[in-house]
Amino acid sequence: SLALPFSEGIIESFFMEYFMKGINSEAIKDSSTIVSGHSYQSKEPGITITMNGTFKKQITKSQAQEGELIYLSKPLGTGYLLAAYFYNSELLSNFDFQKLMIWMKKGNKKISEISKSFKSKITTDISGFGLASHLSDICKSSGLSAEIELNEEILINNNIEILEKFKSTGFKNNYSSSANEISISDKNKLQNILYDPQTNGPLLI
C-alpha cells in the first residue's frame, strides 16, 4: 500500500509514479513482481509491501546444532540511528547518514544465495523484533543456548552515546519480551543493540 501526502491531483500523481518506479526497480532486482495494491491519503508518505512466495525446501528454526557458528550478513543499528536522526538530524554527520542509507538499501539476495550454497541449516532476517528475539526463537526451537560477544564491529555506527540514549519505536516491547531470556556477563554498553528494531536488517545465519 502507498500512503500519499494530502495534495493536489497532479502532485499526488507525481508521488504515485515516483514511488512505483522505486518499488518496481527493487522488485526486479529480486526477481519479484508487483501484482496488486492500493493507495490512500495520509499526512506523511509511506510504503508497505507484503511479500509472498514459494519454496522448494522447508527450513525451520529448530534445525540448529551444537557447535555451529552464528553469522550476521550486515551490521545492526538502523533503529536507534533513525530515532536519533529524527530527533535531531545534526546528531549524525553526513558521512554517518550516508553510511546508514547504504546499508538500508543493501538487499540480502546475494548473501541468501551464498547461504544456500553452503547448505546453511537456518537463515532468517533480523526484523523489527531485533536480534535477541530472533536468536532466542532459534535457541528455544532447537533446545540450545547461544553465546555471542558484543563488540563495535556489529554496529553501523560506533557512537555508543547515541546507542545508549536513543531508542526507536518497538525497543520497549522487544526488551520486555526478550530480556529475561538473556544473561549478560558484564554491564555491556552495547546491550541495547540486542533489542534494536531493524529496518532491512541483516540475515542471521
Q: Residues of each region from the PLM?
A:
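Glycine- and other small-residue-rich loops at beta-strand/loop junctions that grip anionic moieties
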Residues: 62, 73, 100-104, 124-127, ...
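Active-site glycine-rich loop that binds ribose-phosphate moieties when present
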Residues: 50-58, 92-116
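Conserved S/T- and glycine-rich ATP-binding loop of Class I adenylate-forming
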Residues: 67, 125, 205
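Glycine-rich anion-binding loops of enzyme active sites
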Residues: 1-91
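Short pre-catalytic strand/loop immediately N-terminal to key active-site residues, enriched for Gly-Thr
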Residues: 95-103, 121-122, 190-193
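Internal active-site segments that recognize and position negatively charged phosphoryl groups
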Residues: 70, 108-111, 116-122, 127-130
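Glycine-/charge-enriched secondary-structure boundary and capping motifs
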Residues: 10-33, 40-45, 52, 117-119, ...
